[in-house]
């Protein structure tokens, strides 16, 4: 059993999603958004750090998964996003959580089946996969999709390792 915290970073809205994985079964534990309503960036970063730290304390995750920075058209926005990611990662590292990073296209490919999926498609598939009553907020859905991607990637890695081990055992006999 593992608890995974997914983070969709943003300097104004940071989405989070927490799921439990037991084998191939995923269970929704919680999700939401950290909203920073102050104008100055240092204060927003402080709120993101405090919010992520509080979520980690509340849910006690085993793994921390976060979206990688993508190249934005606006350099200033990309820098702010990078700083928001940074404080979220520091919150995880300060609580000794292993950090995993996933590209947005990989997350969409894993959850929806296409790397160019729309936010509404991600919301729908997250709702379906986690058997939720309603679509989560867009940023929370993205964070849950990041957590689901981590489960999928680690599950596939374990299966590949087991297959290699079985092959090696077969050769040794």
From Swiss-Prot:
Organism equals Enterobacter sp. (strain 638)
Q: Where is the active site?
A: 8, 67, 139
Task: List the top taxonomic levels of the source.
Answer: Bacteria, Pseudomonadati, Pseudomonadota, Gammaproteobacteria, Enterobacterales
- Please describe the quaternary structure of this protein: Homodimer which binds Holliday junction (HJ) DNA. The HJ becomes 2-fold symmetrical on binding to RuvC with unstacked arms; it has a different conformation from HJ DNA in complex with RuvA. In the full resolvosome a probable DNA-RuvA(4)-RuvB(12)-RuvC(2) complex forms which resolves the HJ.
Report the protein name in the record. Crossover junction endodeoxyribonuclease RuvC
Q: Mention one GO biological process in which this protein takes part, according to its record.
A: DNA recombination
Q: Which family does it belong to?
A: Belongs to the RuvC family.
Q: Which GO terms describe its molecular function?
A: crossover junction DNA endonuclease activity; DNA binding; magnesium ion binding
Q: Would the keyword Hydrolase be found if you checked this record's keyword annotation?
A: yes
Any Pfam family from its record, for instance, is RuvC
